Design a protein with these regions (language model features):
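Short Gly/charged-rich anion-binding patches and loops
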Residues: 6, 34, 83
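Anionic-ligand-binding alpha/beta catalytic cores of soluble enzymes and soluble regulatory domains
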Residues: 20-72
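Nucleotide-binding motor/catalytic cores of P-loop/tubulin-like NTPases across gene-expression machines
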Residues: 20-28, 72-141
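Single conserved hydrophobic/aromatic residue that forms the stacking wall/gate
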Residues: 1-7, 11
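Conserved beta-strand/loop subsegment of P-loop NTPase cores
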Residues: 13-18
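Generic structural signal for well-ordered, non-membrane alpha-helical segments
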Residues: 11, 49, 81-84
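Short, surface-exposed secondary-structure boundary micro-motifs
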Residues: 144-145
């Protein structure tokens, strides 16, 4: 069995301490404000599960972008350094083949503006081409020809 010392060094540095009993208690809190208060009292910024997911994504070199339409909003997992056409191809191969551009805005800008349409009105939605590297948290609308 071969092992990469670089890979093992990364795994040695990444350790998470997660209390199962605290996570169980957190999972039973349905009120968002109560959850925030509990985390604050425990001196935690986020749940252990959230930390585990974030660390896993970082170690695997993954990020998430979103698409949203009238029927659903969906998260898509891609590798870091993915160009817009390849990200579009995760949805459907026709999106990649006929890629024209992607209307793109960050999640934080959409939240600050109060929605996609407001972000667009404020000029926060960018038109990105084939050389755009998708960033974690991007919300994208792909324009393509069939």
């Amino acid at each position: 069995r071969r092992s990469s010392s670089a890979a093992s060094d990364v795994y040695k540095r990444q350790t998470l301490n997660i209390s199962v009993s605290i996570e169980q208690e957190l999972s039973e809190i349905s009120d968002e404000n109560e959850l925030k208060e509990f985390l604050f009292e425990m001196g935690m910024e986020s749940t252990g599960l959230e930390k585990l997911i974030k660390t896993g994504y970082e170690l695997l070199g993954l990020c998430t972008y979103f698409t949203s339409g009238p029927k659903e909003t969906r998260a898509w997992t891609i590798t870091n350094s993915t160009f817009a056409p390849e990200a579009a191809g995760k949805i459907h191969t026709d999106f990649k083949k006929g890629f024209i551009r992607a209307e793109t805005v960050s999640y934080s800008e959409v939240i600050s503006a109060g929605g996609w349409l407001k972000a667009k009105e404020l000029g926060n939605v960018r038109s990105e081409g084939k050389d755009y590297l998708v960033k974690d948290g991007d919300i994208m609308n792909f324009l393509f020809s069939s």
